[in-house]
A protein has these predicted regions:
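Extracytoplasmic copper-binding redox domains, predominantly the cupredoxin/blue-copper superfamily
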Residues: 1-185
Length: 185
């Protein structure tokens, strides 16, 4: 029996490369956010469509939503009961907004700056989620073993930031054509 051919490596567009690596693995039920930011000003393409945080089964879904700063985000209520969405900046607890959303209702908001936000429902206090807003489109959640990757990263100087278990880890990355591997512990 002939073995199956190996998968072709993921290729990036000309003038770009791939950044992949490993960060501390998330604890069970937790998330590790990995952010790749340019060290010099860049413009990024618009997002295809607004991300959505839904309220379904008296739960926010997803539990952690990644959004782009300055771009719209939708908050939807798919339950058959009234909910509200109360969003506060994580560090300062400054309220971003607090709105009631009826059944099948949608509220749209644009986050003005980067960072973590706590999301709750005052009507159902057990409902809680988080949101991370970033200017860069290069934001991902690490896999269970801590692996992550970004494709089509323009060549240049970048900073990678990892948010894990209350810690913030940072490292500079010089992106060259091809693949760049990085481990952050």
């Amino acid at each position: 029996m002939t073995p199956a051919p190996a998968a072709a490596p993921e290729r990036s567009a000309p003038g770009t490369g791939t950044v992949a690596g490993r960060v501390p693995a998330p604890a069970p039920g937790a998330s590790v956010v990995v952010v790749l930011e340019p060290k010099t000003a860049r413009t990024f393409p618009e997002q295809d469509e607004a991300p959505v945080m839904d309220q379904v089964g008296q739960t926010f879904s997803p539990a952690l939503l990644i959004v782009r700063t300055g771009r719209p985000v939708k908050f939807r209520n798919s339950d058959d009961t009234l909910h509200n969405v109360n969003v506060k900046e994580e560090g300062t607890r400054v309220q971003a907004f607090n709105v009631a959303i009826p059944t099948d209702g949608v509220y749209e908001h644009t986050f003005p700056h980067d960072g973590f936000y706590r999301v709750g429902c005052d009507i159902h206090p057990a409902m809680a989620a988080s949101l991370f807003a970033a200017t860069t489109p290069y934001v991902t959640l690490a896999e269970d073993a801590g692996a992550f990757s970004f494709t089509d990263v323009p060549i240049g100087a970048w900073k990678i930031t990892v948010y894990t278990a209350g810690r913030k880890l940072e490292r500079d990355v010089d992106m060259t054509a091809g693949a760049t591997q990085i481990t952050i512990e």
